[in-house]
Amino acid sequence: MTYHAIGRFIGNFSYLEYQLRFFLIDKIKLDSKFHNALITHDFSLLCTAVQEVHRQTTEPEVYDRLKKLISRVREFNDLRVKVVHGTWFPYQEGGTLLHVSRHSLQDHYTEEMAEYLEQQAELMFDINLEMMTIFLRGRDYPDEEEPAVTGTT
């Protein structure tokens, strides 16, 4: 169960990151020959760029909601760092994670991480759908309706 939870969480995070990059590229109409240059930016900078572009191009209430979602997405990234760089004890107490803070060098054990990661993966998926709805709302769709945002985990 632990390995499944880790994979699901990281997979959902990867898709979320891809979506953020795609919609930023689309919003600023970046020429395709420059797409790879955007891929090299770190996740936090990507979040800042998405937020700043939308601050200047969307209605205040939409921007405020997106800002809250981006804040939550940054929390997912903090968790991702722990998941990826921590030490796992997959068969102990529902998946135990040992993380050592780079800032304080203090270690912290967290038990029952498999269930928690499953919950966070589900929440991340829902937040990604909501952000996609915001991003798609601002696109131009000539002579047709905007596409519906649907999906499953």
Residue ranges of predicted features:
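Amphipathic alpha-helical interface elements
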Residues: M1-E52, S71-H85, F89-Y91, Q120-V149
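Short, glycine/alanine-rich amphipathic alpha-helical segment
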Residues: H41-K68, R102-Q119
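Generic N-terminal initiation segments characterized by hydrophobic and/or small/turn-forming residues
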Residues: Y63, G94-G95, A114, D126, ...
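Acidic interhelical loop/turn segments
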Residues: W88-H108
